[in-house]
Amino acid sequence: AFISVRDEDKAAACELASRLCELDFRIVATRGTADVLKRVGVEAEVVNKVKEGKRPDVVDLLRDRAIDLVINTTAGSEAIRDSRSLRRQTLLSGIPYFTTLAAATSAVSALESRRESQDYEVRSLQEYHQRARELGSKASI
């Protein structure tokens, strides 16, 4: 998982990174985020930002499929501009990309739930509606 967050999100990102480690994710982060993670005991590999001009950078890792989840919060127009190539490559690679900690927290919770319970079934929304029609309005779907 790649994590790069604005300063005000760093404390909450530490908890998320720790939870991702429990799910066997390897953490890759930009220097500032990695420093904070390491201070709280979360192993994090440092990766270059694209704007730093050093290779490999985060887009290289995305292109090589070395990252399978992205958490990236930004502040200010310059940071948003800088993350354009990151967003583009993430989209092209079909990698889950979270731009808020609320969304990332929900995703991590879902991954934890999935790991804890193997007793689940994936269904399409259409299947849920069909089942509701079959059972009537009192049904629990």
Model regions and ranges:
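ATP-dependent carboxylate/acyl-activation modules
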Residues: A1-F98, A104-A107, S113-I141
